[in-house]
Amino acid sequence: MSFLLAGCTAHHTEEHAVSQHSTSSSKKHPSTASKKFTNKIDLHKKYKGFKLATIPTQYRGTWYRANAYEKNATKLVITTHTINGAAAYQQTDPNLKLNRHSEKQNKEYAGNAVVVKSVNNSLKVRGFLDLVDLVYRPGQFKGQPFLFISYSTNPKATNGAIFKDKSAALKYRKFDFSKVN
């Protein structure tokens, strides 16, 4: 599972062209068929010690991030119960200890899902068995709504930003957000 920091993996319907070759007695005739693969979100899946989370309103919507070395922006979509196509869960059992080295837990907590926690005007997001959260904090930058991004290893440090406006994300893609607080 990857999230928007180095770039999010989109978890939505994608079209993939598949090359198929049919062979007759003397010639090969290439043809291309288009197949749709859908990575469906299961909001009803149960995980021991977790319940479906509701993402706070200020984080919802379509956000954009642009890498300083690229001219395109990456999209992050946050809905009521999903982050970039992954169902969002919150931990309900405070005594549950997750161990990324556990084969059993790797099977049990596999899937298109993340753990979220809303703390001190920030949203922490991580995979079930990941060690580090991505921390999103809402703010304004030159009149544009945006989210600061940091790692939970140092949540006060700013490692990047994502904007509601794609053109703002592209405009400020080379800006050093570590100096903004």
Model-derived features: positions:
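C-terminal motif of bacterial Sec signal peptides marking the signal peptidase cleavage site
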Residues: 4-7
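Long, non-globular segments of proteins
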Residues: 9, 78, 177-179
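N-terminal, intrinsically disordered, polar/charged segments of Gram-positive cell-envelope systems
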Residues: 12-61
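Intrinsically disordered, low-complexity segments enriched in Ser/Pro/Gly/Ala and basic residues
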Residues: 18-25, 30-33, 101, 117, ...
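Edge beta-strand at a domain terminus
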Residues: 36-48, 148-181
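Short, solvent-exposed loop/hinge segments that bridge or flank secondary-structure elements
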Residues: 47-53, 60-90
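Contiguous, well-ordered beta-strand patches that form the walls/edges
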Residues: 69-75, 88-161, 181
